[in-house]
Swiss-Prot record:
Record-linked InterPro entries: LexA/Signal_pep-like_sf (IPR036286), Pept_S26A_signal_pept_1 (IPR000223), Peptidase_S26 (IPR019533)
Gene transcribed to yield this protein: spsA
Coiled coil (UniProt feature): none
Record keywords: Cell membrane, Membrane, Transmembrane, Transmembrane helix
Name of this protein: Inactive signal peptidase IA
Source organism of this protein record: Staphylococcus aureus (strain Mu50 / ATCC 700699)
Amino acid sequence: MKKVVKYLISLILAIIIVLFVQTFVIVGHVIPNNDMSPTLNKGDRVIVNKIKVTFNQLNNGDIITYRRGNEIYTSRIIAKPGQSMAFRQGQLYRDDRPVDASYAKNRKIKDFSLRNFKELDGDIIPPNNFVVLNDHDNNQHDSRQFGLIDKKDIIGNISLRYYPFSKWTIQFKS
């Protein structure tokens, strides 16, 4: 009987730990489309880290998952609170300076800036809001369609691709 009780206690503790980790630390996710191609492709399996969101550690270049209505999307942060941004002639400008990162240059994207966002009255991103962009230029499930992304809608940043095994990746910056 003591063994059964110990087993049940261990099982309950394991379930509590798993629930805690999935709620506050990390969660698995399957990429549902090719919006982030070629960086991430449909069917890739990734780990989403929730800690950076909780502690306000999201950075430009981070690939995040976020909710929009009932859907979950994956995009790259290109500008964060307190910054200005614009895309001109295929080049990302942040705070009026060209960004030197592979995701920011030679893009086949129509020119746009913060002035295109209806919900914004100026040229600076307000607190708790981000501008995101997909790596695949033709897929506009990002700020070009949705506008600013509120921090409360961000699930976390992608910190690891573990499948397919041949594309194992830990670092997704530029």
